[in-house]
Structure formats: structure tokens, C-alpha cells
Amino acid sequence: MSTNENTKYFDLHTQGLGYLNRIQEVTPKEGTPFLSVTIAALRGSADNAQYTHFECRVSGKQAQELVRQLKQTVEGSSKVLVGFTLSDLYAETFTFKNGDKAGETGISLKARLLRIAWAKVDGQPFYTAQEDV
């Protein structure tokens, strides 16, 4: 006889739109390799937008497939804008090693990329997710 325990989770999801950058396969010394992307998310007024950068582990299957499809496009000169859903956002500190901020502490925002709702390449529609039925 087995006991079935229901584990409960608290989900913290962040939705927005931003540009894809630095797509790479990461192979840690210990652990499982994973796909990584940096999202430069837009915030503020449309005529003076600011950017917040999220370093993301691409977790959702649909997001993994789409990010891999867009890798060469992002590495080229094209701009890829996406509507995204992130989960498990947290901050991590680091020390700048070069440049004007060398020796100073910085903060990196990290999250899991769960889903891409839509994507545009240089302003042209590339992908739109189908709604869950």
C-alpha cells in the first residue's frame, strides 16, 4: 500500500515582453545541461522605455523548442521580441571583475522561462501560441 501525499506549491509568475539575447547551452561541472537565455524586458512609458534583464533557464518544452529555433536569428543582427511568462524569480549577487564597476557588487535577476506567448522578428510576426483548450 502506498501513501499519496499532495504537495502544494506557491506559484510566482511574471509576464511581460522583451528582447531575447545570449542564447546558450550551459553544461555545469555538476548537474544536468540546460538551455539559457537573457531577456531584456521592457518597462516604463512607451516613449522612454527602460530595460530589466532576466537570466533565464528555459524550462517549458514549447519555450525550449522556440528559443532553439530563434538562436541563429538572435545571434545575427535581427531583433526578437517576445511575450513571456517567467517563474521562480530570485536575485543573486556577484562582483564586477572588469570596467568602471570592477570590485563593486551587482545584482542578477534569475528565473525560469516557462512559456512564450508570441514572437516577432524585426517587427514581423513569427510565432503565436495556441490557447490551451
Predicted features by range, described:
Residues 1-133:
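Single-stranded nucleic acid-binding surfaces, predominantly the OB-fold ssDNA-binding core
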